[in-house]
Every structure is written in structure tokens, then in C-alpha cells.
Amino acid sequence: MIMGIGTDILEISRVIQYIDDNKFLTRILHPDERERFDTFQSEKRKAEYLAGRFCVKEAYAKALGTGIGKLSFQDICCLNDVSGKPYIKDDTNAHVSIAHTDTIATAYVIVTDGNVIL
């Protein structure tokens, strides 16, 4: 059963100025996300990744009904499985989708109770 749905959208240009700001990156990205972020060479890819992860965290907090006020960005870690599918670390009941264009990143998160309804 669906317990909550959250979505977020962000202009990538709003985060590009922060891709070299260690203080901002440390506040937003979980260490596991930061490790992946640091592998990217291009500013464009770094900005896409940062905007996407920011959107996931906002969408996840909305889906839980808490907002970021009850969770910190560090409490939420979005990784990718071997096929590239994004997931929230330590929450198998969260289902994540991230997309971006050249200018916009968006994320959609559904949180379920773990029961499958056919």
C-alpha cells in the first residue's frame, strides 16, 4: 500500500555554483553520494547529480510527510544499484525515480508499507 508520494523539481543552474563548495556539498550529500560525485569530471555532470540528489531528498521527505525539517539531508542517501536504478539506502519501501534535462532535475518518490497489492 502506498503510504506517501513526494516530488521535487529544481533548475540545475541553481546548484552549479555549489559544485566546488565543500561546505555545501558536505551538508547536502551523504558520504556515499559524495564519493560518487567526486568521480565525475565535468561540471555539467556534477551539477546534474547534485540537483538530482537534492530533489530526491526533498521528495523523500515529502513522501514521509516530515519535510526536511525533521530529517537532515545527511539522513537520506540515494545510491544506484548495478543496473543504475536509484534507491534510498536503508529503506526498501521507498521507490525512486530521477530525471533531468539540460536545465531541470526532478525526482519522484513513493513510500509503501512493503505489502504488494496486485
UniProtKB/Swiss-Prot annotation:
Localization in the cell: Cytoplasm
EC number: 2.7.8.7
GO cellular component, one term: cytoplasm
Broadest EC class assigned to this enzyme: transferase
Catalytic reaction annotation: apo-[ACP] + CoA = holo-[ACP] + adenosine 3',5'-bisphosphate + H(+)
GO BP term (any one): fatty acid biosynthetic process
Binding residues annotated for Mg(2+), in chain numbering: D8, E58
Molecular function terms from GO: holo-[acyl-carrier-protein] synthase activity; magnesium ion binding
Disulfide bonds: none
Role this protein plays: Transfers the 4'-phosphopantetheine moiety from coenzyme A to a Ser of acyl-carrier-protein.
Cross-referenced HAMAP family: AcpS
Family: Belongs to the P-Pant transferase superfamily. AcpS family.
Protein name (record): Holo-[acyl-carrier-protein] synthase
Taxonomic lineage from the root: Bacteria, Bacillati, Bacillota, Bacilli, Bacillales
